[in-house]
Amino acid sequence: CTEIFAQARFRKSSDSTIKVIKAEERLKLENIEKLVEATRNFENLEPGKKFTILAPNNKAFKRLNSKTIDYLLSPEHQSDLNDMLSHHTIEGRYTEKQIRAQIEKEGGKTYFKTLSGFSLMVYLDKDNTIIFVDQNNRKIRMVEPNYGKGDNIIHIIDGVILPYSSIY
């Protein structure tokens, strides 16, 4: 089911999101860059729609099993890679300011549905940092907001959002 969902949602990408990721060398995004290039399907999921992409920095991937990237890049695990990327993509273009406003409007926490179907809980911690909570109850911080122009926006996060049944 996950593979069918991913294939139905993702289409060939234009290069704009990958160009933003590559252009921001100081953010250390080489790992997510490799994964996005391997699928070539990170944006333009449905023509005319806008998306928010949560891009893990390299430090985020270092916290995972050392073989995770190799696993995700192998052709036989393409559906796992698509699933992982869909956990990092939210339909709708939400700036940091809009996310904060939604948290405030909802009384301290809110939810954003990812393309995988998971409702990602979002709140502000005591330091006023935006925190995302994945299915494994791991807390992931937004560390660099608001990259990109046009229909899609990228926020850099310090963790990898993992599916509950994840083997990573």
At which residue positions do the language-model features occur?
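Bacterial N-terminal signal peptides
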Residues: 1-2
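Mature, structured domains of secreted/extracytosolic soluble proteins
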Residues: 5-168
